[in-house]
Curated annotation (Swiss-Prot):
Keywords: Aminoacyl-tRNA synthetase, ATP-binding, Cytoplasm, Ligase, Nucleotide-binding, Protein biosynthesis. Homodimer. This is Asparagine--tRNA ligase. It holds the Pfam family tRNA-synt_2. It comes from the Bacteria. One of its GO terms (biological process) is asparaginyl-tRNA aminoacylation. It comes from Shewanella frigidimarina (strain NCIMB 400). Belongs to the class-II aminoacyl-tRNA synthetase family. The lineage of its organism: Bacteria, Pseudomonadati, Pseudomonadota, Gammaproteobacteria, Alteromonadales. It is found in: Cytoplasm. The keyword Metal-binding does not apply. GO terms for molecular function: asparagine-tRNA ligase activity; ATP binding; nucleic acid binding.
Amino acid sequence: MSIASVASVFKGEHAVGSQVTVRGWVRTRRDSKAGISFLAVYDGSCFDPIQGVLPNSLANYNDDVLKLTAGCSVVMTGEVVASPGAGQAFELQVTEIVVTGFVDDPDTYPMSAKRHSIEHLRELAHLRPRTNIIGAVARVRNCLSQAIHRFYHQEGFIWVSTPLITASDCEGAGEMFRVSTLDMENLPRTAEGKVDYDKDFFGKESFLTVSGQLNAETYACALSKVYTFGPTFRAENSNTTRHLAEFWMVEPEVAFATLDDAAELAEKMLKFAFSAVLEERMDDLNFFNERVDKTVIERLQAFVSSDFAQVDYTDAVEILKNCGKKFEFAVEWGIDLQSEHERYLAEEHFKAPVVVKNYPKDIKAFYMRLNDDGKTVAAMDVLAPGIGEIIGGAQREERLDVLDARLAEMDLSQEDYWWYRDLRRYGTVPHSGFGLGFERLVSYVTGVNNIRDVIPFPRAPRSASF
């Protein structure tokens, strides 16, 4: 007797006539007048549940089977047979069923068979993986994650685990969560009356990281090609569909690489990841295409087969100013492009993914390489039809004198970045990288447009339950 996942049965890995045991949870139960019950049982291995056919001759039919409701957990053993009904190739003729857990008071079970709004499900984050939509999101998220690791492994990258606790602000934005063990009711003070962080756990002011990039650069400048993939944190008080306080980032860094090299890597990575989802998770994509966004599959297929367009920021501004479209936010050189501008470029002008390069230095971070014009930096954003910016990257400033000047311009302390400056003092090299917000990627692939629904336990302003 073999333990079988529902997915393995549907893939034909167990011959018709073989005996298998399937373990999972009841989605629905239907009883026929002929004394047969039909259970739809899922185990999370694929989108569709398997149908178990249970005759009333089972020893516990009256005591257990007829009491089964949505959410009950069961272990079914039986024979794999070809399904006479439409919708699935195989079902299970059950010869034994063990109920491992009933649902207390089925009438109040929050995940009953009726459809719930996705907003309501956010309040039940511990139970929402049991729904079709969140289960499908979880499988797609896993597929994308595995594909990204596979891609970088095949490309010869080394995965580096960067710290979550840091004293550096990569973005220079200041929107960071403080990490402290000080007694909030009795804070130690300096002679000037400021909080004395010398008495804190790390002996200095410390924060949750906003990016693993700076740390990854140190390893790229020794191991050539590295990437990080982990959680990052922003104390940005934004209650929008696009913002989380805790989210995951994919951040590759490559030594001896230019901005164009980074753009090429980004295109290659995205196409690899999307191809993996199209190949491995079509059952879930069909659900999203039918219930969430009817363009999901077509959009991914078009993305994979598209050549990326490239345009300088300065030229992009001219395109937007002369397109004849009225935008909510006016366009002029020196502004950061808004989502509406990004989407116009990708969806209406280029009708393809587009890399916008060479942004004004005043709207970009201190570590981005200053171009020869003295006004722009070697930065890029990858814009995707349907969502806008999906990746942000840059060639890093490898010249110590220029880096120091940028730190001074932005009122950042050389002392705080002494170790980052050392990379420019000891065998400096041109190097480039980018950051991909992983939840934004999952949102793009699934069509689920609220970022809080594509991460298991969303963290946002006034939201830290579970």
